[in-house]
Amino acid sequence: MGTLEKKLDNLVNTILLKAENQHELLFGACQSDVKLTNTQEHILMLLSQQRLTNTDLAKALNISQAAVTKAIKSLVKQDMLAGTKDTVDARVTYFELTELAKPIASEHTHHHDETLNVYNRLLQKFSAKELEIVDKFVTVFAEELEG
């Protein structure tokens, strides 16, 4: 195995370790004293942007509805979410952030923005020609991951 392959292997493994048991890799340290899972924080962020149901959240996060239900129950218990029934179909519940949850959702959004800023700073170090190669590599790598 060549040096570049080893570097790539180390990078992928480092990313996996940093994102272990999370559904994303974010830059920036958490400022909140509230202990939530990454999934719970992501749910708060998504709900701060639009009204969603359990099913909508599961699709957006690419996780099971059971996992969303578990996360939501915990957030409701911690007074971070309030459920409201749909006026047309009472079987459908929408969740809204409480005042307690809004700063946490905002911070999670900030971490997403900061992560994109880090990527942008990294990409600015490359020429247009090099960026074409990076883009091609990322595309091919993603295709390999999908199998």
From Swiss-Prot:
Signal peptide per UniProt: none
Pfam name, any one: MarR
Subunit: Homodimer.
Domain HTH marR-type residue range list: 1-143
InterPro entries reported in the protein's UniProt record: AdcR-like, ArsR-like_HTH, HTH_MarR-typ, Metal_resp_HTH_trans_reg, WH-like_DNA-bd_sf, WH_DNA-bd_sf
Organism: Streptococcus pyogenes serotype M6 (strain ATCC BAA-946 / MGAS10394)
Regulation of catalytic or functional activity: Zinc acts as a coregulator and is required for DNA-binding activity.
Alphabetical UniProt keywords: DNA-binding, Metal-binding, Transcription, Transcription regulation, Zinc
Domain of life: Bacteria
UniProt binding sites for Zn(2+) 2: 30, 41, 107
Gene that specifies this protein: adcR
Physiological role: Zinc-responsive regulator.
Protein name per its UniProtKB record: Transcriptional regulator AdcR
DNA-binding region: 54-77
Any GO molecular function: zinc ion binding
Binding positions (Zn(2+) 1): 24, 42, 108, 112
